[in-house]
A protein has these predicted regions:
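Catalytic domains of cell-wall/extracellular-matrix polysaccharide-remodeling enzymes
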Residues: 1-86, 90-108, 114, 120-128
Length: 129
């Protein structure tokens, strides 16, 4: 599945994907494949995986309030050097997208805090090593 999807992404964008997020994170307990084997496979393909250390909480609920999403996404980011926030974008979770302007504004208003893309210089967050 991974190779096919990676190929599809390349065909659609012309960009080779070098980052991966496990559905449920690398610590998920429902995968049919041993996560360490999959991590080794990603390593062999030159792909870095990223988990998250801040959760919006929208994965378990279909429609959290904007205020709840804002609080979940911003309450602990000052305690970390790097925060990677997990958000879900789907038709069943419209308030997640609606909350984004408030989340971004809140983060950008903090001193010494910036929003950056994930690059080869980003220290990955891993649930499982």
């Amino acid at each position: 599945d991974f190779a096919r999807i990676r190929d599809d992404i390349y065909q659609a964008t012309g960009v080779e994907s070098v980052y991966y997020r496990f559905p449920g994170g690398s610590s998920n307990t429902v995968s049919n494949i041993d996560m360490h084997e999959f991590i080794d496979y990603l390593d062999s393909q030159g792909v870095e995986y990223f988990d998250w250390n801040v959760s919006s909480g929208d994965g378990g609920s279909s429609n959290l309030s904007i205020d709840t999403l804002l609080e979940n996404c911003t309450e602990d980011i000052d305690t970390r050097d790097t925060s990677i926030i997990l958000l879900h974008d789907s038709a069943e979770k419209p308030t997640t997208v609606e909350a984004l302007p408030d989340i971004i504004e809140n983060i950008l208003a903090r001193p010494d805090t910036v929003i950056l893309p994930i690059t080869e210089n980003t220290r990955p967050v891993h649930h499982v090593e």
